[in-house]
Design a protein with these regions (language model features):
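Active-site-adjacent pocket-lining segments in enzyme domains
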Residues: 3-6, 12, 27-35, 52-55, ...
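Histidine-anchored nucleotide/phosphate-binding helix
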Residues: 21
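A cross-family phosphate/adenosyl-ligand binding-site feature
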Residues: 41-53
């Protein structure tokens, strides 16, 4: 069974984080919600409070098959400023493991070089963060071990793309049917 982490920052887009967690858990993927702050309690961009599973400081990112970044503001800024997040992204990328980001969060990958040479997408207005990438406006883009997506309205497609990457396209199709999607 695959094991991934989703980095939860205060100010994250709640739907982008929690939809992914819900759908991946339904598919049997072990996904840990890691708070990048000093508390398990996280407050999203729209004031919704939820509790992460662990503090990021209590886990080793090397133990995961991939990491996921929800977008939202100021959540994306908080992720980008966090040295543990940046270190984890570099380690995951160097190891060829999954890195998935949605909405504004793919801009982090453009700025730190993870997206260099990759086909990517993001929320409109962040195109300039990808000077060394091929930017497209598809809902979800998978290029090797990097998956990017546009925003809240594409969160289910994003989660299904992660299932396809980690398990199989059949598993993603089955999940879409099971949740009455499309």
């Amino acid at each position: 069974m695959s094991k991934v982490a989703i980095f939860m920052a205060d100010g994250c887009e709640e739907i982008e984080g929690l939809t992914v967690v819900d759908i991946l858990r339904r598919a049997g993927v072990k996904i840990d919600m890691l708070s990048i702050g000093d508390s398990l309690n996280v407050t999203g961009a729209h004031g919704i409070q939820f509790r992460a599973d662990y503090l990021m400081t209590d886990k080793n990112s090397d133990d995961y098959d991939g990491v996921i970044l929800p977008g939202g503001m100021p959540g994306t800024t908080n992720l980008e400023k966090n040295t543990l997040v940046q270190s984890a992204l570099k380690k995951q990328f160097s190891a060829g493991k999954l890195i998935a980001a949605i909405c504004a969060a793919p801009s982090i990958l453009g700025k730190n070089g993870v997206a260099n040479g990759k086909k990517v997408t993001s929320y409109p207005g962040f195109e300039d963060a990808f000077p060394r990438s091929t930017y497209v406006t598809d809902s979800v883009v998978t290029d090797g071990n990097v998956i990017t997506s546009r925003g809240m309205g594409t969160a289910i497609d994003f989660a299904l793309a992660i299932i396809e990457y980690l398990i199989s396209s059949d598993a993603a199709e089955d999940m879409a049917k099971n949740i009455m999607y499309k």
